[in-house]
Every structure is written in C-alpha cells, then in structure tokens.
C-alpha cells in the first residue's frame, strides 16, 4: 500500500478555490510574500519563502479570518531587455513565457493564492496607475527634474546603478564607467526622512536588524553648516559637520571630485587626477590633490589649504568637509600623507594627543573661547558664535537623498512627460494614460531604443499643439514594487480607497533581508506619498516583517577546481574519483550547489518539499539542504498516511470527556501539544510546529486501538487538521479517508480543552520499609485508599502482598509500605 502523492496533489490543486469575499464581515488578514521577478524558473529560496507565507495564510483561514493571499510578477527589468538584445526576442514575449512557466511551478507547490488577483507590473492596466501617481506627485511637489551625476556605460549607452558598477567597469559591457551629468527625475523621499526614521519605533514586529539598517541608511545627524570664504574668488564654500567644536583643530578643507568648485579648475594635473580618482572606491587609500586655493578660518587669522579628496562624497552633506586630523581617522591618515598639521583640541585630562586621533569625550583646549568646555557645551557655544557672525547655523542632515527614478532603458514604465520647445515640461493629460511602450523596437545597437524610435517618440504638445517629444526614460523598477501590495487589495489592480483601508497594512510580509533598505524603505515612502495625495490612509505598509534565511548547500569541485552540481559530485564519488568538498554556502548558479525544486516535487511530492524547508530551522535562519532530511520527510508522510488508512474507520464525532487513567494522560498530552503548536503558529515558530505534530503522531501510535479507539479517532482528527497548513494535499486526502465533511481547508481550527492543560498531576514516592523503591504520577489530592492501591501495584514485583503489615500515605508526597 503506497501513497499516490502525484494524483492526490494534482486533484486538490484543481479543486481548491481561495478567492476573497468582497462582502465578508470576517476580520481580515493580509499575507504576502515578496513577489518574484519572472526569471522562468523557481529556486529553493522561492519555495521556502512561499511555503512560510502559505502556512500563515492557511492557518489564519482556519482561525476564521478573511485572508488575502495574492501573487504577482515584478516583470520589468534588465534581464528581459538583455534577453531581447541577445536573442532577438521581444521582452514582453520573453517575460510572458517565463510567467507562464513559473505560474505552473508555483501551482505545483499547492500554494493557497488568490489567483484571481494575479497581476504583472509590465501590463498597461497596472502601470497606468503609477503614471497617474507620478502626475499627482508632480502636483503635490513630490516629483521634480534636475541635472545630476550618474554612472554612464559608454558601450551600452545607459545609466548604471551603483550596484551595477564592478571595479569601476560596467557589469555587462566591461567598459570603464564614466561620470556624466544628465537630467533625471527624482521623488522627494527626503520630505519624509524624519517621519520614516521616527516611525521605525512603531514597527514592533520588524526584525531589529532591519530597523537598524534603515535607521543608518536614513542617517540623521545633527551638526552645523559653515560658510568658508575662498581667497581670490568671490565665492564661499559651504560645509556640513557633526563636529563644529573641532573647528580650531582644522588644518585643511576638502571637496569631492564632483563638487561645483572643481568644475572651474582647468589645471591639467588636477583634471588627470580627478579622472584617475573616479575609478577608485571610497575604501581605497586616502588620496587627494591641492587645488591651489585657500580658505579663511572663521575665527583665526590663518589660511587653510583646499584639497580634492577621494573620501569626500557629494552624496553626504554639502560634498565638502573641514579636516581635523587629531580627531578623525580619515583626516589623520590624509594629514600624515600630505604633511598637514595635526592640532589636538579635545583631551581626556588636559593631555595633548599627537600620535593617533582621539575620538572620546573630554575637555576643549587650543580653542580660544571654547577652552575648558565639555564637547556638548562647546558645540552649542560655537554654533551660537557662527550664527552671530552670519557664517553658519545649526543643521540637521540626512544621509538619505531624493530617489532618482530615471532609467535609460526600454523595458520599464514610460514616464508620462512631454518635452515641448515652447511650453517646456508638460505632463501627459490623465485622459491619455497609459503611455504604452511601443512593440516595434530594435535592440541592435546600444542605448535606449525609445530614444531612437521613429514615431513613438514624437507627439503633439497637449498645451500648444506643436510637435514635441516624449520623455524616453522609464521608471526605476523599484517604482512598481513600491505599491503593488496596494493594487492587490482591489480586483481590478487599481487603488480603491475603501478596499485599501480595509486590507492594508499587510499583516505578514515575507522576504529576504537583502531588501531591508531599498524596497522596504521605498514602500514606506510610497505609502506616505499616496496618503498625502489622498489615495488611502495607511502610512506603514507592513505590520509584521519576516525575513527568511537562505537555503544553503555543500559546494563541490573536481580535481581541476571546476564547480560541480551535487548530482555530478555523487556520480564521480561513485566512480572513485577525487573531488573537493567545500563549505556550506548559499545556493547559487555560479557555484552549482543548487537543487531544483521541480525535481524534488516530481520525485517526492510538494508536501515533502514543503515539510523539509519548514523543518528543523526557524524561518529567519539559514537552512542547510540535506538529501537525508528530504528522505526523512517523505518517510514521515507515508508513515502517517498508512497509520490513518490502516485504521479503516475513524469516527469524527468522538466523545472522550469521561476517559480516565492512562488514556486520560494520553489525551492531556495531545491537547497540550495542540495548545503549544497553536502558539507556535501564532508566533511563526514553524520548525517547532513540525516537531510537535511529529510528537503527536508518535503519541497516537502508542495508544492501544482495543481500549483507546475513540481517543485515537480524536487524535487523528486533530492531527489531520493541524498538518494542513504545512502539508495541505496529504491532509485533504486523509480528511476524505476518514469521512470528513467538505474541504478540510474550510474547517475551523481545533481548540485545546483548557481543563486538560492544567497540570494537576504530582509525583509521589513509593517506599518499602522507608526505602525508595519507585515513583508514581497521580492526580493531585487523590483519595488515600486509591493512592495506596496504585502505589502497591507499582511495586507488586518487589513484595509479597500477603506480608504487608500496614501502609502509610502522605497525600501528594509519599506512600510507605511496611512489611
């Protein structure tokens, strides 16, 4: 007798219906896993991510919630455009094929998705809404256009994100990346910087690590801006510093290579230096070049040299700093390299420190009117002096910068803007949305095909009627993923205020910690921006955030150091060949330490795959792949199936209220496991859930079918219901086997009997002539005669009952048999 998982799983996948009721009065629960990019094939990371979310969704349905559990596709992006370029295929066709393949794969896992709410971000019906958002952002002052520095790939002729620049070269072309100034569109995320920072504290169910990462990314710092007069130029240099108290220790100023002042410097040596410096990273050796310019110290009669330095970033503050080498590590290294003065102005106990920078608290000295003050007081005093002189002020600075959303790519959402020579920047009228991508594009040359399109690019100006040109940049793909969770709330992929307010925020959001900053921060910003524009009233998109760990596997190499797939390694080992067994690492295509989920599902079934990725390891921790572990899960499923089927009949209308003795103990254990397992599900301790229902399975198997059939029936009914969120196909099949009514996923969650959870048992010592011979567990305050009988029976193999002279019993503590 064998469990036919293939037919069972296919049958129930076709039978389930998880649509959401529009008119339900139930309390809502919104469960969402981060939607995937349609690469065409799911991997084990996907499987683990989606299995975690599905357990929560199924459990919440069983607890009586109206569950929204949708799925969609983050469909725009570079891979589709690159595939089009490399294979001469339309990105839309390539993307749709991949979506179709992945949809089939996801359905084979048995995920309880609301498939009727499926969306794809590359559909005009989806992105027409974000084009309208953009127009509203313009109206509310949340979007603007300006010239800014970008990473430019001269071969692909496009802007690259910082993450796409590897060792100063384009990740795809290998060309040396240039810095260019281009007009770009931005969203004013900085308008919400303080609110984004402050409200992190309200996210009680977010991992602290994620909140810390966002806090650092926003990077609030308090200090001062100071205007330095540049000798020989009718200009001032504005800097921001968090350490204005160290101003008397300043020995130089430095600007970044992209600072506006640098653009006026024509010296060949300086231009060559800047060109070489741009390819180097911030963590390289601290280098710089003297500009030939000096600035006036605000309080001292001395000049400070102005340098261009590679550790000064335009992205922070004003792109300029004053250097105090005695109290900053970077400044110290720079000063040593270029022989600049090192002037200490803070010390612990009036002791000068010259050999290394001092970063601690202390007393000011060498600082005129600041001498003798502690640092905090010195900051206040010097800021007041700067304000009195009109050359500085107290300033709060954020590391966070406005979000540049322009991409010189075809496969993205068109930005709904028209450029007219007479009227300037003109928004596309709302009635003309969506601006749809043309399909007749060519990818034969580098750059953005939209920029060279013979017809799509040209359009009449909505204001004056003259010929104008469309904006050919497209939105950053993070734009689409920053609001998709709101689109799922409505059936037509739009933003409906009532349904958004009903279902949002997302109650459980599941995804990798690699999205801790950009995606999650942009989504938080979008909710604030859309709230400001009147779309809904939800500021925070995600109540509980679960960042699942990675799926890891041992790595293998052959004798020549070539990476091997696990199955290749097994074949070589079987042939006696030598291979190198490496460390356990995250599954990756490059190192070939991957396992195809489709192979596991085909060989063992979806429930085995689901059970394995949920067993042993807490969701937030990395898990190690184990073939033996998969086999063990498969054996458990078959064992449970046989155990239920071999009972032949199970009475789902059991009554065990009056059972006593050992059977009562079994029933208590079952209900305690149910209670603990339910608490584990509430707190997403899914590995503990698995451990408890495995224990429950073994417990039920111990019960004597002759004396405890009714209790077995109760245990089986509970067990089948509690495994359903994790192994839904098996559970549905067993529910039908025992004569269950309707579909199991629609049945309520079993409730543990509170009276059985009270631990009213005590351990009593059994003595013979005062010496301990056994211990027994009995109910608290058991009548003495019953206690004596149980105690006597427990040592019946040690005494001749006919020789018992008397029995002394102390309730709840000890029984002494005197012979």
UniProtKB/Swiss-Prot annotation:
One of its GO terms (molecular function) is leucine-tRNA ligase activity. The lineage of its organism: Bacteria, Pseudomonadati, Pseudomonadota, Alphaproteobacteria, Rickettsiales. The gene is leuS. Its EC number is 6.1.1.4. It is an enzyme of class 6 (ligase). A motif ('KMSKS' region) lies at residues 586-590. GO terms for cellular component: cytosol. Belongs to the class-I aminoacyl-tRNA synthetase family. It is found in: Cytoplasm. GO terms for biological process: leucyl-tRNA aminoacylation. It comes from the Bacteria. A motif ('HIGH' region) lies at residues 36-46. ATP binds at residue 589. This is Leucine--tRNA ligase. HAMAP family: Leu_tRNA_synth_B. Keywords: Aminoacyl-tRNA synthetase, ATP-binding, Cytoplasm, Ligase, Nucleotide-binding, Protein biosynthesis. PANTHER family: LEUCINE--TRNA LIGASE, MITOCHONDRIAL, LEUCYL-TRNA SYNTHETASE. InterPro entries: aa-tRNA-synth_I_CS, aa-tRNA-synth_Ia, Leu-tRNA-ligase, Leu_tRNA-synth_edit, M/V/L/I-tRNA-synth_anticd-bd, Methionyl/Leucyl_tRNA_Synth, Rossmann-like_a/b/a_fold, tRNAsynth_Ia_anticodon-bd. It comes from Wolbachia pipientis subsp. Culex pipiens (strain wPip). Disulfide bonds: none annotated. It catalyses: tRNA(Leu) + L-leucine + ATP = L-leucyl-tRNA(Leu) + AMP + diphosphate.
């Amino acid at each position: 007798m064998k469990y036919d998982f293939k037919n069972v799983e296919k049958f129930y996948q076709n039978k389930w219906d998880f649509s959401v009721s529009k008119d339900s009065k139930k309390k809502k629960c919104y469960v969402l896993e981060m939607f995937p990019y349609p690469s065409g094939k799911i991997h084990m990371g996907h499987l683990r991510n989606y299995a975690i979310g599905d357990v929560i969704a199924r459990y919440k349905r069983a607890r009586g919630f109206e569950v929204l559990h949708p799925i969609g596709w983050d469909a725009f992006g570079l891979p589709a455009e690159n595939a089009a370029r490399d294979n001469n295929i339309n990105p839309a066709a390539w993307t749709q094929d991949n979506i179709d393949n992945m949809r089939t794969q996801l359905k084979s896992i048995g995920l309880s998705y609301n498939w009727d709410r499926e969306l794809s971000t590359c559909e005009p019906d989806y992105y027409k809404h974000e084009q309208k958002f953009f127009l509203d952002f313009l109206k509310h002052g949340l979007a603007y256009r300006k010239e800014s520095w970008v990473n430019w790939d001269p071969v692909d002729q496009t802007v690259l994100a910082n993450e796409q620049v590897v060792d100063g070269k384009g990740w795809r072309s290998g060309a040396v990346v240039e810095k260019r100034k281009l007009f770009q569109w931005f969203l004013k995320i900085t308008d919400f910087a303080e609110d984004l920072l402050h409200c992190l504290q309200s996210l009680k169910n977010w991992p602290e690590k994620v909140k810390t990462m966002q806090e650092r990314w926003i990077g609030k710092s308090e200090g001062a801006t100071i205007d330095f007069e540049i000798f020989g130029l009718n200009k001032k240099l504005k800097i921001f510093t968090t350490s204005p108290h160290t101003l008397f220790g300043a020995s130089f100023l430095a600007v970044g290579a992209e600072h506006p002042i640098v653009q006026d410097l024509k010296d060949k040596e300086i231009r060559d230096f800047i060109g070489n410096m741009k390819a180097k990273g911030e963590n390289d050796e601290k280098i710089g070049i003297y500009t030939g310019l000096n600035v006036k110290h605000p309080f001292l009669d001395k000049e400070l040299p102005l340098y261009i330095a590679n550790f000064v970033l335009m992205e922070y503050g004003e792109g300029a700093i004053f250097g105090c080498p005695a109290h900053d590590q970077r400044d110290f290294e720079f000063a040593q390299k270029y022989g600049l003065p090192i002037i200490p102005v803070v010390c612990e106990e009036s002791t000068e420190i010259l050999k290394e920078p001092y970063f601690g608290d202390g007393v000011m000295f060498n600082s005129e009117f600041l001498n003798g003050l502690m640092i905090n007081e010195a900051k206040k005093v010097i800021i007041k002096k700067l304000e009195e002189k009109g050359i500085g002020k107290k300033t709060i600075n954020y590391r966070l910068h406005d979000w540049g959303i322009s991409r010189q790519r075809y496969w993205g959402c068109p930005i709904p803007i028209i450029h007219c020579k007479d009227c300037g920047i003109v928004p596309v009228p709302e009635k003309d949305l969506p601006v749809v991508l043309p399909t007749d594009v060519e990818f034969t040359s580098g750059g953005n095909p939209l920029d060279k399109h013979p017809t799509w690019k040209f359009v009449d100006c909505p204001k004056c009627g003259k010929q104008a040109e469309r904006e050919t940049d497209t939105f950053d793909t993070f734009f689409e993923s920053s609001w998709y969770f709101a689109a799922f709330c409505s059936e037509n992929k739009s933003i409906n205020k009532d349904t958004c307010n009903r279902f949002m925020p997302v109650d459980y959001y599941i995804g990798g910690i690699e999205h801790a900053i950009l995606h999650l921060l942009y989504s938080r910003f979008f909710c604030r921006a859309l709230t400001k524009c009147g779309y809904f009233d939800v500021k925070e998109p995600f109540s509980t955030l679960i960042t699942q760990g990675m799926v890891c596997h041992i790595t293998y190499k052959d004798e020549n150091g070539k990476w091997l797939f696990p199955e290749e390694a097994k074949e070589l080992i079987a042939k006696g060949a030598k291979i190198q067994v490496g460390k356990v690492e995250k599954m990756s295509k490059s190192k070939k330490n991957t396992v195809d989920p489709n192979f596991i599902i085909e060989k063992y079934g979806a429930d085995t795959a689901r059970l394995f990725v949920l067993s042993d390891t807490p969701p937030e921790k990395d898990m190690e792949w184990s073939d033996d572990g998969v086999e063990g899960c498969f054996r458990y499923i078959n064992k449970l199936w046989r155990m239920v089927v071999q009972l032949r009949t199970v009475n789902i209308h059991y009554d065990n209220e009056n059972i006593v003795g050992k059977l009562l103990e079994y029933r208590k254990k079952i209900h305690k496991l149910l209670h603990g397992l339910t608490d584990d599900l509430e707190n997403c301790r899914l590995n503990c859930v698995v451990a408890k229902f495995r224990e429950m399975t073994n417990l039920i198997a111990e019960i004597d079918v002759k004396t405890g059939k009714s209790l077995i029936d109760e245990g089986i009914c509970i067990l089948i219901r509690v495994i359903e969120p994790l192994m839904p196909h098996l559970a549905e099949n067993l529910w039908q086997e025992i004569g269950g009514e309707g579909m199991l996923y629609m049945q309520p969650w079993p409730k543990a009997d509170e009276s059985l959870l009270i631990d009213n048992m005590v351990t009593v010592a059994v003595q013979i002539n005062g010496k301990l011979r056994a211990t027994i567990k009995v109910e608290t305050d058991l009548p003495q005669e019953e206690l004596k009988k149980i105690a006597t029976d427990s040592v019946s193999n040690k005494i001749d009952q006919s020789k018992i002279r008397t029995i002394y019993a102390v309730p709840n503590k000890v029984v002494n048999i005197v012979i």
